[in-house]
Amino acid sequence: MWFKKRIIIKETNILLKVDDKGYFKKAEEIILKNRLELERYILKNPYFLTSYFPVDVEDDAPEIVRLMAIAGEIANVGPMASVAGAIAEMLIKNLNAKNIIAENGGDICLRAKKDVIIGLYAGNSKITGEVGFRLKKEKIKNIYGVCTSSATVGHSVSFGEADAVTVFAKSSAIADAAATAICNASRGRDEEEMINNALEKADEIKKIDGIFVVVKDKVGIKGKIPELVKTDKRITLGELFDIY
């Protein structure tokens, strides 16, 4: 059995699904701790918040700060591009649940001993709610990240035009930063050029397994992505979790 709770702390809005509801209180403590450490670091180092480029941090910086800095360096973006994925990753890392999914604004970190299907939300594209990704239990038995960036959905800054760029990686912080970088590159005269530019950008980023790009009703795929499945559910990414 799975239990669900939405945890909202300032900008953090996490939908948590876990196999034991006894983890909810600990989850709130972990989120709050990491947010406070990040906020305190930003007060002393405001450039960490505003930079669109990688930022070097001290070896003794808080773990979440170091995680975000590494993700930003790998994807060649500012560290805050990975904040949602990083908070979700720190949560999964510090909870001992065998089956746990944390969705933070469309960025997902999970660990499970069962197959999980995650739905895709790509704005007004016809693909929204029609397809999902089946993540095999062998792939997600340890921490795994599935993060999506969009130029047409949400309030995050994007310089691209893709409706959705979904990245799969063994770190949700890295997946989040990579999704931002790849989405930023999705520019061009038509859908095909936008997708090709996004796929070329993905070639520059290490430590990601694969990407799925949606521009209107066209898609592009690079690397290894989970099995695509038909969902027939017009529902946002994060609310659709089918567990087997």
UniProtKB/Swiss-Prot annotation:
NCBIfam families: PRK04334.1-1. SUPFAM superfamilies: ApbE-like (SSF143631). It comes from Methanocaldococcus jannaschii (strain ATCC 43067 / DSM 2661 / JAL-1 / JCM 10045 / NBRC 100440) (Methanococcus jannaschii). Belongs to the UPF0280 family. Signal peptide: none annotated. InterPro entries: ApbE-like_sf, MA1715-like, UPF0280. This is UPF0280 protein MJ1526.
